[in-house]
Amino acid sequence: MPIDEATQAAVHALWEAGTRHGRPPAPVPEADPWDASDVDGSADALDTARGRVSVLFDGSPSLVVHLHRDGRDTVRVEDVVDLDVPRRDLAAVVEALLVGRARRRPTVRGFLGNLLGVLLSNPAPSDLVVRVGGEDGSAPREYDGPVLMAAPLSGWLMSLPVED
């Protein structure tokens, strides 16, 4: 199954964003961002059932970007948060995560809310929030996803500032 040019361009943009911050992604065999002749890709490496290409950024935070044919992509952060991001903002969201421009937004308040979170095995019930855009006069866009705590807790996620 061939990889379309938009997906190829997205892989290239992700590679550039990661390289700018010293975190180039793992090689993507089905979409070599530097080989213009590789637009057709490799059917073996591509998830043909869902038509997706995965781009992995090792380190902290650990990021896995799933590029889907329809352009509605997903960024998985530290294996506990999924952000649904349209293709136009994908590289900006990844770059914001790589440089630490993300925040946690508490989803409960007060002693009882936090106690309930602890009892339900989520000691810090919150959403991960990433804001992008707005620099060029356009309205900033916000992407968020629930922080689903799993053992072991992510030190990177827990160290993020909390929104007021």
Describe the predicted segments one by one.
Residues 1, 37, 51-53, 75, ...:
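Residue-level marker of intrinsically disordered, low-complexity segments enriched
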Residues 1-50:
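N-terminal "first-domain core" detector
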Residues 2-5, 9, 81, 85-89, ...:
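Alpha-helix boundary/N-cap detector
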Residues 3, 95-164:
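Acidic, proline/glycine-rich low-complexity IDRs
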Residues 9-13, 89-96:
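Long, highly charged amphipathic alpha-helices
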Residues 17, 21, 93-100:
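Conserved short hydrophobic interaction patches
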Residues 41-45, 59-69, 110, 114-121:
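Short linear motifs in intrinsically disordered
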Residues 50-89, 136-164:
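Intrinsically disordered, low-complexity regulatory segments enriched in Ser/Thr/Pro
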